[in-house]
Amino acid sequence: SYFVPGVRLQYLQKPSRQLGFILGHQGEGSLLSYLKNQGWATSLYAGIRSETKEYDYAQISIELTEKGLEEYQEILGVTHSYIKLMKKAGFQEHVFDELKTMASLEEVYSNKGEGARRAENIANELNMYNFKDAGRINYAYGDPKPENFDSLLSYFTLENMLVLLSAKGLKTDKEEYHYKTKYSYFENDSLYLALLRDKPSHTFELPKPNSFIPKKVKIPNREIKDNIKPRLLINNKNTKIYFAKDHEFLRPKGVISYKILFPKNKMSAQHRAFLKIYIECVRESMNEVAFPARLAGLSYSLFD
């Protein structure tokens, strides 16, 4: 984690969201993709937590494998290699534009909540933001300011870094007073800093323009009707395909669902176990492709 100046008042540019977007990206060439290929990590989260108007803290959280735990110093070096690439590349205008586009779509079509929770959210935001933007802070965007992004990223340095390593079996030499939690604390010496700084360059890529982001959204004119039944398009020995047009919610989205039926005598307990393993393998192998689609509001699910 890194302590950074408060970015709450930069909500129209959202440099913290851009930074978390790039660091936490899971597509091809990303930091997480590299860590997975090395067998070091299974997931990664990056973002900035707003504490006060004066300061926030940025966090990169990586879930390690057993192999990754052994190589955690190497992972720190790799992470800072990626941060160096971000600093060299600077502000990514297409990332800002994509976040702005998706925010505008979410503002129009997402569920905003209602009742007491909605009122409480607006009241809280009235204490911190302009009246006209209260209730829509997550969706509000102004003109980009690259200097805000670059300034925020400049605080991602080794000298400003706090590393927390949490796992079973770690050696500790201290005990917390109130809860008796075992822990250790030490500050990096020059050798440790040299280990982090002197890393070879890795094959990283910053997020490319996302082809899944819609350029425009259009809903065909439809009258709200009751008792609309799905229409059977294909009906043969092996396949049945239905189609149903939405006449109620009028959202720019659709759902395609496939159900594959196996003969009961072909699905033993062993086959079901293999199927679950296969599903997890498909999900993992599809992640680099599916992640950009998820950012655009698309998704898929695979289950037995």
Identify the function of each model-found stretch.
Residues S1-D304:
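Mature, solvent-exposed C-terminal subdomains and processed small-chain segments of exported/organellar
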